[in-house]
Amino acid sequence: MTQTLTQLENSDAFIARHIGPTPEEQQQMLAQIGAADLDTLLARIVPADIQLPAAPPIGAACSEQQALDELRAIAAQNQCYRSFIGMGYYGVQTPPAIQRNMLENPGWYTAYTPYQPEVSQGRLEALLNFQQMTLDLTGLDLASASLLDEATAAAEAMGLARRASRLKQANTFFIAQDVHPQTIDVVCTRAQSCGVEVIIDDARRAADHRDLFGVLLQQVGTQGDLHDYRALMDSLRERGVITCMAADPLALVLLEAPGRQGADVVFGSAQRFGVPMGYGGPHAAFFACREAFKRAMPGRIIGVARDAAGEPALRMAMQTREQHIRREKANSNICTSQVLLANIAGMYAVYHGPQGLRRIAERVHRLADILALGLQQKGVTLRNHCWFDTLTVAVPDKGAVLARALGFGINLRGDLDGAVGISFDECSTRDDLEALFTILLGDGHALDIDTLDTLVQEACEGSIPAALLRREPILTHPVFNRYHSETALMRYMHALERRDLALNQAMIPLGSCTMKLNAAAEMIPITWPEFAALHPFCPPEQAQGYRLLLSQLAEWLVQLTGYDAVCLQPNSGAQGEYAGLLAIRRYHESRGEGQRTRCLIPASAHGTNPASAQMAGMEVEVVACDEQGNIDLHDLRERARQAGERLAAIMVTYPSTHGVYEETIREVCQIVHQYGGQVYLDGANMNAQVGITTPGYIGADVSHLNLHKTFAIPHGGGGPGMGPIGVKAHLAPFVPGHRVVQLAGLTTRQGAVSAAPFGSASILPISWMYIRMMGAEGLRRASTVAILNANYIARRLGAVYPVLYRGKEGYVAHECILDLRPLKARSGISEMDIAKRLIDYGFHAPTMSFPVAGTLMVEPTESENKAELDRFIAAMLAIHDEITRVETGEWPLQDNPLVNAPHTQRELVGEWHHPYGRELAVFPTPQTRENKYWPAVKRLDDVYGDRHLQCSCPPLSDWA
């Protein structure tokens, strides 16, 4: 039969490319689980009262090329002016070798957070390099593996100071008035939520205040002033006040390390180490502190440990500080950080090395010096006495100067009274200097750059006082001194990549993580200069393309969530939780009900939920779950009744973290609303809702959306992420705002939770592309096939690994929990042993012991085809057979392929004294013989790692 032109155009072809199982495979799987078709399957699984009566109106699918063409037209509406705005965001030259081999490489951007260190050694080494870079630049003892952005890091620094302070009666945090305004905004938001008083004043008056537990200073102020705070920090230390300092990594190449000057905590943005501005993000923040504060440190810390063979290996250290273990008692709610961006920044330092970084820093500083000298020769007043890269220039007619600059395609900072700000960066050139002289002085300035350069070099006093110059060397470890050719760097990055297991190698079936395809067409636009090169505070008329993209994406998300408004600012899921809970608090306060601070959270909740509630100033109360894994309605009613007028909210996840669609979810919402509370529906499992139901239709008031789960942004090995929040109309006035940029379409007057007004804006094109190419029907089909895949695995494995929770008709949602406790009781083999043995079979383990200890939670996503599902099923069945051989005594419990897993190449060629063969150890299936993933290390010794904390690069002799 002849096809029509419309059929031949195949505009919905991407749907089949995104969804793994073919229609034929889907029918085979449906037959296996006892359903005639996908609609029948949904009818049996999803409660009828929450199923949408019609598809969300977001339009039809389109082809990859059509979506790219449409997005290219949107991007063309952005205007890429040269930015001299500064304020923590700078032009960069991302080395092409890093862009191609890391930023654009699925081996780097599709991996998950390195909870399984044996399959993450490459990424962990790159993060250790980032930590070493941070330690060298800051002069402190302990560094983390990135935070969300500089402003968030400042808020975390305040939290650390409060936790670690010996001044337990003190409740005031001092902020120097020349800290970046967006940083002040975010810190004040956090302080308000946790009951901390804030003073913003001239830093010289910090010592006058007596009730301080901490102080926030900025080494190079927002207007460019370079400060010597040594005497101030000495006086504060004598009083027990903790000093936190914001710093610029490029400035630190030339300036004395703040830790050596007396700072206790140092943080900043690593953006200018090779990461584009991207209209505000994503960017990695660095964070370092003194050894004494290690237990109060926020975020991930990579530590050097050893494996079962005694070889050096890397892991995430001191995880007992974190939300997935400590819950509401955690140091922070941080889950996703900015791993991919931290790795780019660290690799930038590896590529340039100490000499290359110094050359870049000196050139940037020289350009500022030349401009300053030329202006001073012409009688122009500078408001700076010492500087690194930024000058504040007094001008009689600021509007005219800004307008002239626009004529040259240049943006200057324009929010200063009677002055403009000019910040140089790696991209600044001689031509820019010429243009700036003309803008500020007119065409006939007659200044010669080379002459000015000579005068700057001959000057007796520099713009950086000698006492503030760095004297100690930086980046002395060999890793920063051997990969300066592109060939060497390319091979180093490839060697690291091979040590990791990412989606380009195998399925990553982590429950509650949604490791779906991040399609190439979705990723391509993020490096377009029209998206990558914009400053977040550029004039709004230069960002019309971004504004259009953001408004379209927000409208689509409104339709897909059933809410009335969406705020795109939060740049992680945990930050979205925090923002949503703050909206609830502010709403209650606006109604004169500020006493509503009790937050009910089911026992099965993600660890971020109680951590976020605590951060938002709420008290956490746990609600019981019944034997079927559902919220215990009797317990909920009683706790809601007891809370009464103190009830603020409930945080629920849907489908539940137990992997089922709770039949009573609407009743849960009604109970909470009855007692005056709000319903926060965690969007972690939104991949099982899209196109089928919505949080708003269910009855929730606010949700965050993990765009790095449901909407195809890659996990990046632990970030970036995006966690925008959807809200009902009554909460819309209480979502985050921004003191620098007015958020179009939102009436909020609230403080910011992120440094940039739209969070990590430059990765939002990924979700735009995903939704545009899938369309309403494709998105519904994706959710449905995700449910099909999970049920196929549950049915195939359920006979040997009991599925802990099922719905009333025996089905699961988009993930299933395999109960390993009976096996462990019979054989002694643990969930950890099974997880590590899966590495030998070429798989990343499912989520271990969450939400129930002794289990594995499996989420296959819609992108995995039947062959990959069958490969995973075969691996799990083979592992069960191996457990049986231990159980029957064929293999001793102390020496078998499970407890010894994973097996390395080094082990294969060494002495072999095990009761099982080498082939079974490393090639347990035919597929592993054809495409083998080799772990770089054996199982890690976690106890050793925490007892011997080392978060810096070890000497090369340790790896010999």
UniProtKB/Swiss-Prot annotation:
EC numbers, comma separated: 1.4.4.2
Keywords for this protein: Oxidoreductase, Pyridoxal phosphate
Record CDD domains: GDC-P (cd00613)
Root EC class: oxidoreductase
Entries under InterPro entries matching the protein: GcvP (IPR003437), GDC-P_C (IPR049316), GDC-P_N (IPR049315), GDC_P (IPR020581), PyrdxlP-dep_Trfase (IPR015424), PyrdxlP-dep_Trfase_major (IPR015421), PyrdxlP-dep_Trfase_small (IPR015422)
Cofactor: pyridoxal 5'-phosphate
Reaction equation(s) it catalyzes: N(6)-[(R)-lipoyl]-L-lysyl-[glycine-cleavage complex H protein] + glycine + H(+) = N(6)-[(R)-S(8)-aminomethyldihydrolipoyl]-L-lysyl-[glycine-cleavage complex H protein] + CO2
Record carries keyword Oxidoreductase: yes
UniProt xrefs under Pfam families: GcvP2_C, GDC-P
Example of a GO MF term: glycine binding
GO cellular component terms, semicolon-separated: cytosol; glycine cleavage complex
Gene Ontology biological process terms, A to Z: glycine decarboxylation via glycine cleavage system
Residue numbers of N6-(pyridoxal phosphate)lysine PTMs: K709
Subunit structure: The glycine cleavage system is composed of four proteins: P, T, L and H.
Function noted in UniProt: The glycine cleavage system catalyzes the degradation of glycine. The P protein binds the alpha-amino group of glycine through its pyridoxal phosphate cofactor; CO(2) is released and the remaining methylamine moiety is then transferred to the lipoamide cofactor of the H protein.
Family: Belongs to the GcvP family.
Protein name: Glycine dehydrogenase (decarboxylating)
Gene responsible for this protein: gcvP
